[in-house]
Amino acid sequence: MTRMLIAIFSMLLAGPVAARDGAPRIDEIVWYNIDSYCSFTRADHRFDYNDPESWRWVLFTNFPAGDGADPIESPFMRIDGQLKQLAQTGIRSLDGGAVRSYQSHDANPYLVEVSLLEGERGIESSAFSGVITVSRNGASSEIAYKGDCGA
């Protein structure tokens, strides 16, 4: 009985694999009816407007603050269970889009790169897809995403 309790206690303390190897965990933000400018989900996620359970985001942005403001300059992500607002640190061109670099506002910041590959353009929105990579202390995680930006 004692061995079993020790084994169970050890498993509970171990936490997820990402926590053990030090890689940041990219979590979903569950926010039904979010009023965002850009909303990105995991690439394999099926979004259904009428299903509140499907409103799961890996990155979102607020609407631009004013004329000419960059709506993707300060996105939000949930990393290691905490909602983080990111600050843009750079942009570089990529065939078919761009790679934007960000960092969190922590003393030991998370570094984030988002490849924005342009997809279909509509009257009020543009589709994007790519990869989001989150790094910290030499370890990183990445996910493929899809989504759009616009009103």
What is the role of each PLM region?
Residues 14-16:
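N-terminal signal peptide c-region/cleavage motif recognized by signal peptidases
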Residues 20-151:
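Cysteine-centric segments in proteins
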Residues 1-8:
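Sec-dependent signal peptide recognition
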